[in-house]
Amino acid sequence: MRVLGIDPGSRHLGWGLLVRQGTRIEHVAHGVIDIDTSGTFAARLVEIDDELGKVIASHAPDAAAVESLFFAKDAQSAAKLGHARGVVLLRLARAGVPISEYPPALVKRTIVGRGAAEKAQVAQVMTAVLRLAAPPRPDAADALAIAMTHLSAAGFAAALAASGAPVPRRARPRRARLG
């Protein structure tokens, strides 16, 4: 199973693709879509749609795992994030990719062992578990962690045990409702 993890944002959108083969989870690719902030917000949303479409076309995921909304202190930032997430969900749905959503605290608890973990801790664990040559950018590390959380039910505990990292509780996906 090829899972595309997505950490949505209106300035930077992280993505990471993992594949499960039997009990093994392997890194395929990851990256960050840096959105041009010089234009209108609507132009940013178009760029998210276009660039994510290229990632989906290049990697043909079987499923997607997207970070769910969380409460932000700034209402305007929360609204912009909500719009960006909407574009992500629409692009995935139009591509026929099944979508699951995970709250940030669950992802952090699954990957690091506690829901209030720092981004650097998530990147450190993902670098070790996936045997990456260098730590990914924070948005990409989060996206890889979201994909790993999705794959956790059938193999993540074994991958963590092999890496020497603490074994977290299993996570259950929450299917996105589109309509």
From Swiss-Prot:
InterPro entries xref list: RNaseH-like_sf, RNaseH_sf, X-over_junc_endoDNase_Mg_BS, X-over_junc_endoDNase_RuvC
Cofactor binding, note field: Binds 2 Mg(2+) ion per subunit.
UniProt family annotation: Belongs to the RuvC family.
EC main group: hydrolase
Cofactor: Mg(2+)
Cellular component GO terms, alphabetical: cytoplasm; Holliday junction resolvase complex
EC number of the protein: 3.1.21.10
Active-site residues annotated for this sequence: 7, 67, 139
Key words of the record: Cytoplasm, DNA damage, DNA recombination, DNA repair, DNA-binding, Endonuclease, Hydrolase, Magnesium, Metal-binding, Nuclease
Protein name as it appears in the record: Crossover junction endodeoxyribonuclease RuvC
Binding residues annotated for Mg(2+) 2, in chain numbering: 67
One GO-annotated biological process of the protein: DNA recombination
Binding-site residues for Mg(2+) 1, renumbered to this chain: 7, 139
Reactions this protein catalyses: Endonucleolytic cleavage at a junction such as a reciprocal single-stranded crossover between two homologous DNA duplexes (Holliday junction)
Ranges in a coiled coil: none
UniProt-listed Pfam families: RuvC
Disulfides per UniProt: none
Role: The RuvA-RuvB-RuvC complex processes Holliday junction (HJ) DNA during genetic recombination and DNA repair. Endonuclease that resolves HJ intermediates. Cleaves cruciform DNA by making single-stranded nicks across the HJ at symmetrical positions within the homologous arms, yielding a 5'-phosphate and a 3'-hydroxyl group; requires a central core of homology in the junction. The consensus cleavage sequence is 5'-(A/T)TT(C/G)-3'. Cleavage occurs on the 3'-side of the TT dinucleotide at the point of strand exchange.
Gene3D superfamilies attached to this UniProt entry: Ribonuclease H-like superfamily/Ribonuclease H
Gene: ruvC
